[in-house]
């Protein structure tokens, strides 16, 4: 199957004082549609930075990140972010003056993708995340951390992007809710054909991915595909 996202000899580093700290060194990795990937590795190894490169929030120092075979520089970083990728980071970046339903609808309005029946779809996503209709209309500040995380995930899913990126999406959730998130990601990949890439420390989550990508020695190493 053709890759939807590809790292082609990507090198990335940052400066810490006079020291250059390497994250990736000529790293290659391909991600296909219709699969759930997890990225694993030690704390501080650069897993979140890898997501920022995949989401065009950072650019490689060397090498290329490709979407459907085209360099993101040629597609345009803003166009790529607005149309093709949705990101859930640990800092949820929710609009606190809006309620959960309005947050999801706001993301739907910003995306360049066509989304029919926006309000109905937004409500369905929030219900799938375990929020009640009453909670959908609460101010964000009145929700727990776990509830806010679910809203952030629903907001990303509502954009109908080709690629879903998530940084520790089950980190603040109880076991049952976390499993529900994993199953939603699996459905997005297997039924909707999305490419879902999640950073996780959870062995349970990683075990349920189609492919595990390990960040090791500044390379992205794909383990063999798992039978899930």
Question: For each predicted feature, which ranges?
Answer:
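Helix-to-loop junction immediately C-terminal to a conserved catalytic motif
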Residues: 55
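Conserved ABC transporter NBD signature motif
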Residues: 63-72
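ABC ATPase NBD coupling module
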Residues: 72-86
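Short coil-to-helix segment of the ABC ATPase nucleotide-binding domain corresponding to the Q-loop/switch region
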Residues: 98-107
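Conserved ABC ATPase "signature" region
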Residues: 117-134
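Catalytic Walker B motif of ABC-type/P-loop ATPase nucleotide-binding domains
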Residues: 164-167
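Conserved ABC ATPase signature
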Residues: 139-143, 147-149
């Amino acid at each position: 199957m053709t890759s939807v996202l590809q790292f082609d000899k990507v090198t990335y580093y940052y400066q810490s004082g006079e020291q250059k700290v390497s994250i990736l060194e000529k790293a290659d990795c391909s991600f296909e549609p219709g699969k759930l990937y997890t990225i694993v590795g030690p704390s501080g190894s650069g897993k979140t930075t890898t997501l920022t490169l995949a989401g065009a929030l950072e650019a490689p120092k060397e090498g290329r990140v490709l979407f459907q075979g085209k360099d993101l520089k040629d597609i345009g970083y803003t166009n790529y972010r607005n149309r093709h990728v949705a990101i859930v980071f640990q800092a949820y970046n929710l609009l606190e003056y809006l309620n959960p339903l309005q947050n999801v609808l706001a993301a739907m309005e910003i995306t360049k993708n066509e989304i029919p029946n926006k309000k109905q779809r937004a409500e369905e996503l929030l219900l799938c995340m375990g929020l009640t209709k009453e909670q959908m209309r609460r101010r964000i500040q009145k929700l727990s951390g776990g509830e806010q995380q679910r809203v952030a995930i629903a907001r990303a899913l509502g954009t109908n992007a080709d690629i879903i990126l998530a940084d520790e999406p089950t980190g603040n959730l109880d076991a049952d809710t976390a499993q529900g998130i994993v199953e939603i990601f699996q459905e997005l990949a297997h039924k909707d054909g999305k490419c879902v890439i999640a950073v996780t420390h959870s062995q349970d989550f990683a075990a349920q991915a189609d492919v595990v990508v390990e960040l090791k020695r500044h390379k992205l190493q794909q383990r063999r595909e798992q039978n899930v």
